[in-house]
């Protein structure tokens, strides 16, 4: 059965500490990746591993930017110009310096994560800002950051030949905040992979389309 705000288990909110932990675990794992693997495909994505990590860093920075203005936009993005380096690549507004290698890319990821952590810690809970998945509060952006970090690290781990199993409590908080209709009963990590179209669950085929809901709950 789906998770319920009234009958389901009580799950703590997503916090800045959760984002900091997820980014730290991601960076630690990526530092051990073989350098030759970064040009290979990232799991089921059409992007390579470098592009996927760069996309993740941009996501984290984008969430921080959305919370930054004195009056954050509720119906659009903060107007930073976007670009892509190839037609099928991710659309981003910052690029890591390729000459700095994978170590530099991981630093960019850490820096973008740190900026979001700071914004989530310091932005009042009543603040709202636009996201395509729903106008979100700081906790909503923290949850989106967890989703992106945990799931794209799955893509990267597949592409780089690494093992990635994030803490169950982080997965539970993402599911409760962004995927309240996700089924109970399975481990949180496989359920999050199912909810984001990465894997099947027993009796539930892999999703072709999916959507998270970052709408502020109050």
Task: Name the predicted role of every residue range.
Residues 2-28, 32-45, 61-89, 100-218:
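Structured surface interface patches that mediate subunit assembly and partner/cofactor docking
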Residues 52:
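Extended, alpha-helix-rich binding/interface surfaces that flank or overlap catalytic cores
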Residues 55-56:
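Glycine-rich loop at the start of a catalytic domain that most often binds anionic cofactors/ligands
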Residues 90-94:
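Acidic catalytic motifs of isoprenoid enzymes
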Residues 97:
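Glycine- and acidic-residue-rich catalytic/RNA-contacting loop of pseudouridine synthases
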């Amino acid at each position: 059965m789906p998770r319920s705000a009234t009958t389901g288990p009580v799950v703590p909110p997503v916090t800045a500490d959760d984002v900091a932990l997820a980014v730290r675990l991601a960076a630690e794992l990526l530092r051990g990746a073989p350098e030759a693997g970064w040009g290979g495909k990232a799991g089921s994505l059409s992007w390579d591993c470098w592009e996927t990590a760069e996309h993740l860093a941009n996501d984290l920075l984008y969430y921080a930017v959305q919370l930054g203005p004195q009056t954050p936009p509720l119906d659009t993005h903060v107007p930073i110009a976007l670009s892509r380096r190839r037609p099928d690549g991710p659309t981003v507004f910052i690029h890591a310096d390729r000459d700095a290698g994978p170590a530099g890319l991981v630093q960019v990821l850490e820096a973008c994560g740190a900026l979001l952590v700071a914004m989530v810690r310091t932005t009042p809970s009543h603040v709202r800002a636009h996201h395509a998945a729903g106008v979100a509060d700081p906790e909503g952006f923290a949850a989106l950051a967890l989703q992106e970090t945990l799931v794209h690290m799955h893509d990267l781990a597949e592409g780089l030949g690494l093992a990635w199993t994030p803490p169950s409590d982080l997965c539970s908080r993402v599911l409760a905040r962004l995927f309240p209709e996700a089924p109970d009963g399975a481990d949180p990590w496989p359920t999050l992979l199912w909810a984001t179209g990465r894997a099947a669950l027993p009796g539930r085929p892999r999703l072709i389309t999916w959507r998270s809901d970052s709408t502020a709950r109050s």
